[in-house]
């Protein structure tokens, strides 16, 4: 919030210099998962935990599942040694009892909520809002344990980013990930397009040499885009597309 009182009695221009301080606690940010409408976090009727894009960058998270490890009250766990799928556990309940949303819409099915968390690139996420407990049932019958609302990035400026990340599991198995993100805006800011993608190749890892991998091989490709058109000041048409292959 910026509050400044200024009185000008002449026609001469007046120059003002001021500094903005970052809100460390994040209480003034707007969330939509509390009541399905945008409101300040400090006035929301339920507790909403937010993980921003800065948190994904600080933790070097490649996918959504890696970033959720740092969210209070959530736990990512691997439940299958054969396929290596991971699910989020909230309030001690399995992933099937949590509702996963993209821009407040229940696009994810119960099956995709298990396998899809590893395939959403972190560079496409603006923030993740988490509501724990029965109050999140506002979004559907699956939201018994809680709701995870994924807010993707809105096109705000023209840019293109490409990043590569390599990790060695146990000094043996390589994990290579390449991600890209591009935004194109019109001159009047009424039309915008944001594209994102990720390619990941993870080699299998066998710790004790018994022929069974503790960490399975993964090769997935993810691509999608977000677009919008504003025909008026209070109207907006949006079109989103996501494709995932593993």
Regions found by a protein language model. Give the residues of each.
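Short strand-turn segments of transmembrane beta-barrel domains in outer membranes
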Residues: 135-136, 147, 153-184, 216
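Membrane-embedded beta-strand positions in outer-membrane beta-barrel channels/transporters
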Residues: 17, 87, 127, 147, ...
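Periplasmic-side early beta-strands and strand-to-turn transitions of outer-membrane beta-barrels
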Residues: 160-165, 183-246
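Non-catalytic regulatory/gating segments with a bias toward low-complexity or hydrophobic composition
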Residues: 68, 128-129, 148-150
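Short, polar/charged loop or turn motifs at beta-strand boundaries
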Residues: 46-64, 87-93, 103, 168-170
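Short, acidic, small-residue-rich periplasmic hinge/interaction motif at the N-terminus
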Residues: 9-57, 95
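Transmembrane beta-barrel outer-membrane domains
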Residues: 25, 81, 141, 171-175, ...
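Short acidic/polar hinge/loop motifs at secondary-structure boundaries
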Residues: 87-89, 105-132, 153
